[in-house]
Each structure stands twice: as structure tokens, then as C-alpha cells.
Amino acid sequence: MAVTLKKFSADRLDDCVSLLADAFVRNPLHRSAFGDNRLDQNRAFFRIGLRHMFIGPSFMALDDRDGFPCGYVHFNAWPNCLPAPEELPYAVATQLQPLGEAIPQVIRWFGRWCHLDPSEPHVHLGPIGVAPDRQRQGVGTALMRCYIEHLEREKAAGYLETDRQENVEFYKKFGFLLLRAEELIGTQVWYMWRPEDA
């Protein structure tokens, strides 16, 4: 499938919120935090992210047939890739209220990720998502190449978290190594690192 990568722009906010919600609604962490098939909660989560949290480079994959976003990738350099754990209460008070009853799970989830974020310089990947009807057509690979090219230009290490076993193998193709695995809010999570010289 032919796609063109373009920097994310706010005029595509609603399109990217919908595509990310569709891409992640069946992911184990999202099901644990929000419940099964909660597109409404996933949309609220990604709307918050796109407006307030995903600071740094973000790109959309636009379908060459219709120009519509079919993929999204965000990455950000350490030490600004995740908030410090002590900043999470402020985020709850100012940004996360639309998530309602899911807030405690989201805080456990992101609190753990903030705690485990490596202290070594890196560029943190996430989210990366592809519309369900465009998966396994090369869109995710195109988005990953965008990220890897950034790592190589910046001579930087990469870091990511995933809640899908099949993604572990996908990321290994791009030079990522498994750092650790653990259960988090009732589901398995894998943490991966790509050395600067991969």
C-alpha cells in the first residue's frame, strides 16, 4: 500500500484521534484500563494525548489513494519523553478528568512507565498505530522507518513499550532488544531498547 508521511497538523486532530482509537481499542492495556470495545474512552485518551502529551515529532501516514490518515507515529527525546512520576497528580487534575473511572488504571499504567523510563539518553517511541483495515500492508513499517531514520540522524538510542507479543518480533526487525517483561494492570508488557549503534 502506498503512503506518504507528513508531519501531524492540528487540522487532522479528529482523524488521528479516530484512527488511534480504532488501532488501540483491542490492545490488552487499553482493554484493562478502559474496558472492552470502549472506543469512547480510547478517543478521549488519544484526544488528551494529541492535545497535551505527545510533544515532539509526530507524523501521519496518508493513504495515497484518498489522502486520509491511516497511520500515526510519535517520538520524543529524553528527558522530556514522559512526565516525572511526581507530575502525574497534576496531570490528573488538569488533563485526565475526561477519562473518569479509568483514571486509577491509567495512573498505575503511566506511573509505572514513568518510573521505568531509562535514565540514559534515548528517543521514546509511542504511540505508533495503524488503522485496522490498513494493517499488514507496510504502513507500520513506513512509520518505523521514519523513527529509525530519526534515531540514525540524531545518533540516538531508542526505547518503547508494547503490550502485544507479535509486536516484540516486529520491533526486533528494527534492531530493538528486549529489556524486560512484566504484568501491568492485569496484562503483559514488554520493554525494548535499541542501542545507538544498532
Model-identified regions with their sequence ranges:
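Conserved acetyl-CoA-binding loop-helix of GNAT-fold acetyltransferases
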Residues: 130, 136-149, 173
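A short beta-loop-alpha structural element at the N-terminal edge
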Residues: 4-18, 26-29
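Conserved beta-strand-loop-alpha-helix junction that forms the acyl-donor binding cleft
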Residues: 126-135, 159-169, 185-186, 195-196
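Conserved beta-hairpin
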Residues: 55-73, 131
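Conserved active-site alpha-helix within GNAT-family acetyltransferase domains
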Residues: 141, 153-155, 164-181, 185-188
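Conserved acyl-donor/pantetheine-binding loop and adjacent beta-alpha core of acyl/acetyltransferases
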Residues: 72-129, 135
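Conserved GNAT acetyl-CoA-binding A-motif
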Residues: 121-123, 150-163
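A short helix-loop-beta-strand connector motif used in the catalytic cores of GNAT acetyltransferases and
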Residues: 44-61, 120-124
